């Protein structure tokens, strides 16, 4: 939701600026004077005007800051959470160039309040984005993110990703200048070990840039010094959070094949074998490191002679798990199918393998990270739009609990709940009562009032489901283990009634999945969407006929020409 709202705002801002500039040109033409732009100074936000403000000397800025506000502005205080209006109205003072560190901390302070797509980003985010449009400004923003984001804030790394992901792409010169300023190497990684926030933030910035600049720019960014720095951060002497984000940065650099080869040749797998032993550690920070180390060994940095985790994990008692075939593209799922993590900049979602239609059902989630996750219930009709920022609770077919922002989500609208913010190790309970048509959420056994709004759209076909913001992780219990806080009413568990074959329980690493896909033989006349059924359906009025009837019934527009589908005609009879 946050990312999508920010992107919509940027698009509308650019359009608005263009219209304002066009209007100025017409006024200048009509008045026949070059002073037309100056007469519109209180409403125009063009780049020239912003630049002029940035060059105002310090004494003038101090003088303006000391100006007594008008009576109107004093009588109408602005909501501190609501961002200011764009442009400068009659009651809004001229903008000042603020301290970059202050803007970053302001963004971190209000990030929890960004919940609706139609909500403007805060003034601090807008200003930082404008500053980053120049190389010098972009470098100032990046250095500030490294310098001031505190270690203890659970949303700190997510704010780094959010701000950098929406800033303009850096130029080659800016990247070169950044590497010179940071001057990273193994020795730097050993410095300031008592202040791990700087190293955590540096690794988070590098990971975000590697993800954003995949390709030649990413190859150029991974210099020998930066590689040495990240590898040094993986040593056991480092703070666990530094180890975690150094590993995530290496994962993102490895999205480019040349970088993956370079990193693999550094014997990184030997270090990860030790770190994967932390996957079940009671320290939740170390547990994150262990999860990512195990995932990297299974998916990216393979070690010769090491058995892949899915080949040795015991799944005998597990009958319901997260569905690796019903998940958005960047979510990481553990080999036992009960733990998930997102390290991408998108909002990743997953449903479980078991669907319920009647009765009373309950499952629990252990919070491993205390950031933004939306966890609850969803039907098959609930859509995963990870790049647009939509997940569980963002349509009429799902409802979700958000313990970080203390919200209940339904149909992309939120309302506050009275539970405190969740923290690492908390247990969240999810009760679905299809007899009474209600959902009840629990935090460490304390329940909220029932939620019923989702039943106005659907009354059956519910799955346990969750969506994850960047760097978030949790573990699910569908009944394979005793519950920590079972509700007092009688209920059923997925694990008691579900069934999975041995093959359905396997969660293959990505390289194994790709290898299997290469072996798949696709028939000439198969559906172009599912590739399973025969393409036997013609769409009207466009006439395209590359789909089966099952897929055609799920579409409103033709995937080839985007024309609206009025009718569907089955052309041939066949045996599937």
Curated annotation (Swiss-Prot):
According to the UniProt record, list the residues that bear Phosphoserine.
50
Composition bias (Basic residues) maps to 83-97
* InterPro entries reported for this sequence: ARM-type_fold, B30.2/SPRY, B30.2/SPRY_sf, ConA-like_dom_sf, RNF123/RSPRY1-like, SPRY_dom, SPRY_RSPRY1, Znf_RING
Tell me what turns on expression of this protein: Up-regulated in response to denervation-induced skeletal muscle atrophy. Induced by MYOD1.
Q: Which residues cross the membrane?
A: none
Q: Where is the protein localized?
A: Secreted
One Pfam family named in its UniProt record: zf-C3HC4_3
Compositional bias (Polar residues) at which positions? Answer: 58-73
- Hey, what's the signal peptide range on this chain? 1-16
**One of the record's GO cellular component terms:** extracellular region
Q: List the Gene Ontology MF annotations in alphabetical order.
A: ubiquitin-protein transferase activity; zinc ion binding
Q: Which domain of life is it from?
A: Eukaryota
Query: Region (Disordered) spans which residues?
Result: 53-99
Every B30.2/SPRY domain range: 300-483
Primary location group = secreted
The residues forming a coiled coil are none
In Swiss-Prot or TrEMBL terms, this protein is called: RING finger and SPRY domain-containing protein 1
Q: Which organism is it from?
A: Mus musculus (Mouse)
């Amino acid at each position: 939701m946050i990312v999508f709202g920010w992107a919509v705002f940027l698009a509308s801002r650019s359009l608005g600026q263009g219209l304002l500039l066009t209007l100025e040109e017409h006024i200048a033409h009509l008045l026949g004077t070059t002073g037309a732009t100056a007469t519109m100074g209180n409403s125009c936000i063009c780049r020239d005007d912003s630049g002029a403000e940035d060059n105002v000397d310090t004494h003038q800025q101090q003088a303006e800051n000391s100006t007594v506000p008008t009576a109107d502005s004093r009588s109408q205080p602005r909501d501190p959470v609501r961002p200011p209006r764009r442009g400068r109205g009659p009651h809004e003072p001229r903008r000042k160039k603020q301290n970059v560190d202050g803007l970053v901390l302001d963004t971190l302070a209000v990030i929890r309040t960004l919940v609706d797509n139609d909500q403007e980003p805060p003034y601090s985010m807008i200003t930082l984005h404008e500053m980053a449009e120049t190389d010098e400004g972009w470098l100032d923003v990046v250095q500030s993110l490294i310098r001031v984001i505190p270690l203890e804030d659970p949303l700190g790394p997510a704010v780094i990703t959010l701000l950098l992901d929406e800033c303009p792409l850096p130029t080659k010169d800016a990247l070169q200048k950044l590497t010179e300023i940071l001057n990273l190497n193994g020795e730097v990684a050993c410095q300031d070990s008592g202040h791990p926030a700087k190293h955590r933030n540096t690794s988070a910035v590098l990971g975000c840039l590697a993800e954003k600049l995949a390709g030649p720019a990413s190859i150029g960014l991974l210099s020998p010094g930066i590689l040495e720095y990240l590898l040094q951060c993986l040593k056991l002497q480092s703070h666990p959070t530094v180890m975690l984000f150094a590993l995530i940065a290496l994962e993102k650099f490895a999205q480019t094949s040349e970088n993956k080869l370079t990193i693999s040749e550094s014997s990184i797998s030997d270090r990860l074998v030790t770190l994967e032993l932390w996957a079940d550690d009671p320290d939740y920070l170390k547990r994150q490191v262990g999860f990512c180390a195990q995932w990297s060994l299974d998916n990216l940095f393979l070690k010769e002679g090491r058995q892949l985790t899915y080949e040795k994990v015991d799944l005998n008692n597990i009958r319901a798990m997260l569905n690796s075939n019903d998940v958005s593209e960047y979510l990481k799922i553990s080999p036992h199918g009960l733990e998930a993590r997102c390290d991408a900049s998108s909002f990743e979602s997953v449903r479980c393998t078991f669907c319920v239609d009647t009765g009373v059902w309950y499952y629990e989630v252990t919070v491993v990270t205390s950031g933004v996750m939306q966890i609850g219930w969803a039907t098959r009709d609930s859509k995963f739009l990870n790049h647009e920022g939509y997940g569980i609770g963002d349509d009429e077919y799902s409802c979700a609990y958000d313990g970080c922002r203390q919200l209940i989500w339904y149909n992309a609208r939120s309302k506050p709940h009275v539970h405190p913010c969740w923290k690492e190790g908390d247990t969240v309970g999810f009760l679905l009562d299809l007899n009474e048509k209600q959902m009840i959420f629990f935090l460490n056994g304390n329940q909220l009032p029932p939620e019923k709004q989702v039943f106005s759209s659907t009354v059956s076909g519910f799955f346990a489901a969750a969506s994850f913001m960047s760097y978030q992780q949790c573990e699910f219990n569908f009944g394979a283990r005793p519950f920590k806080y079972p509700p007092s009413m009688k209920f059923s568990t997925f694990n008691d009634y579900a069934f999975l074959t041995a093959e359905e329980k396997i969660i293959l690493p990505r390289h194994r999945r790709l290898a299997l896909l290469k072996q798949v033989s696709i028939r000439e006349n198969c559906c172009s969407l599912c590739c399973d059924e025969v393409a036997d359906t013609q769409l009207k009025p466009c006439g395209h006929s590359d789909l089966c009837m099952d897929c055609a019934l799920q579409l409103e527009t033709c995937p080839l020409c985007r024309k609206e589908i009025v009718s569907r005609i089955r052309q041939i009879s066949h045996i599937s």
